[in-house]
Amino acid sequence: MKPIDREILRIALPAVVANITVPLLGLIDMSIAGHLGDAAFIGAMSVGATMFNLVYWNFGFLRMGTSGLTAQAYGRGDTSEAISVLLRACSLATAIALAIVMLQYPLQWLALKVISPSSEVLHLAQRYFFVVVWGAPAILAMMAIKGWFLGMQDSQSAMRISICVDVVNVIASLVAVFVLRMGFMGIATGTLVAEYVALAYSVHLLYKKHGTALRQASIAQALRGGNMRGFMSVNADIFVRSFCLMLVTLAFISVGARSGNLTLAVNSLIMQLFILFSYSMDGIAFAGEALVGRYEGANDREQLRCTVKRLFVWGSAVMVVYCIAYGGLPEVIFSLLTSDADVVSAAVSYRLWCVAIPIASMAAFVWDGVFIGQTRTRGMLLAVVTASAAFFVICFASPYPEGNNRLWTAFITYLAMRSAVQTWLYMRRG
């Protein structure tokens, strides 16, 4: 195996492991809610999680922007600047978190307007939100810290933080619900406790590995006007990009919901296949962020180009595996996700769309990692804006016959456009 392949796997595999823990945690929390004796608890758990996804989704730049800038500083051997990036990211995370806490009432109102749950679920979801929202400082700070570790070529520390929050969440929720008899609110309390325990663990890792550099750092220097403006410019592009991604996702769900419960269920299952593919591809993208950023910072163009080629080799291998699985075993996969024979049968009829997902999106995932590493965030924004425009035109203004196939045509085109535009931008500049 080539040295660059070992480097890619060294960073990618811990990231994939960390990603896998996310749905497992959701399943365990859902299982705890399911044992409380009322279906409304399950609904409230789902709605509460969705509310925070809507709130936090747009702040993914705290991880991505931090990762790229840190990797470049690492490549230059500039430890002082790498620490300064961390301080800027954590300062911005704290400011955003305080704003979320102060604006929690209008935020929960807006999120519930978008989701529109039943009155019983709404009341429980509100109670869940008003407890877990106090974890915003911990959640956003950990986004920045995990991005920083990734930029420092240390995805294992980022993985440990993710596993820590998941394990503590499960233990704390079980204790709060079944030992302390807190009921549904025990799940929210367990989540809140886990977030701050994981934040403490994150700080412990930072000082254990980089304590000397952190103690010598100057917050005033890190936050000086010119330095902060460059940091904010990178993150502003990613913020707008994330907002566009959220709009497409919400539109996809909304349009699918109008076609009836069966279509909504089918789309949800197929979207799980996209999410499953993304768990693997995110690992390769994270490796791209770290390694491309490192070689960009070191101004090593030859090694950078070699890294990009190998990222696409690994991405293509993952794509082929998923295409074979989705094309050859759709009934088996869908049967694992639901026992409803009608839903499985309907979902299998969309086999070609399932296969198209990895083909259309593979390059987009890889390019995202490359562009973040190079901090070419304006190019990422251009790709997503163009792709989003294509999605909305096909979905709402095309002569293509209405129905679920038009929706999937729009979504696959959106993924393919992201891949195509970023390919063009990279080839133009190299």
Kindly give the residue locations of the regions a language model identified.
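Short alpha-helical transmembrane segments in multi-pass integral membrane proteins
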Residues: M1-A12, T70-P137, V168-I171, V177-F239, ...
